[in-house]
């Protein structure tokens, strides 16, 4: 597992399955290898939405928050 700080309160973790974007301490989007970008279907805040868009997952498929939680 590799941890990469991207910006203030924005971190990426890479596992064997995916690259996962954390906004603050919450996984909010992921690039799942072989599937593509996904993002949470839960609204957290304007800042978290900005993090998702900046990371490139704006057009990703919305998935339940539990799916992102289970990637870590």
Residue ranges of predicted features:
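Terminal leader/tail segments of proteins
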Residues: 1-72
């Amino acid at each position: 597992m590799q941890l990469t700080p991207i910006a203030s309160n924005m971190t990426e973790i890479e596992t064997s399955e995916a690259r996962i974007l954390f906004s603050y301490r919450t996984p909010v989007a992921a690039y799942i290898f072989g599937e593509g970008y996904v993002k949470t279907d839960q609204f957290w805040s304007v800042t978290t939405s900005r993090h998702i868009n900046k990371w490139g997952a704006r057009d990703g498929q919305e998935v339940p928050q539990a799916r992102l939680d289970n990637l870590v």
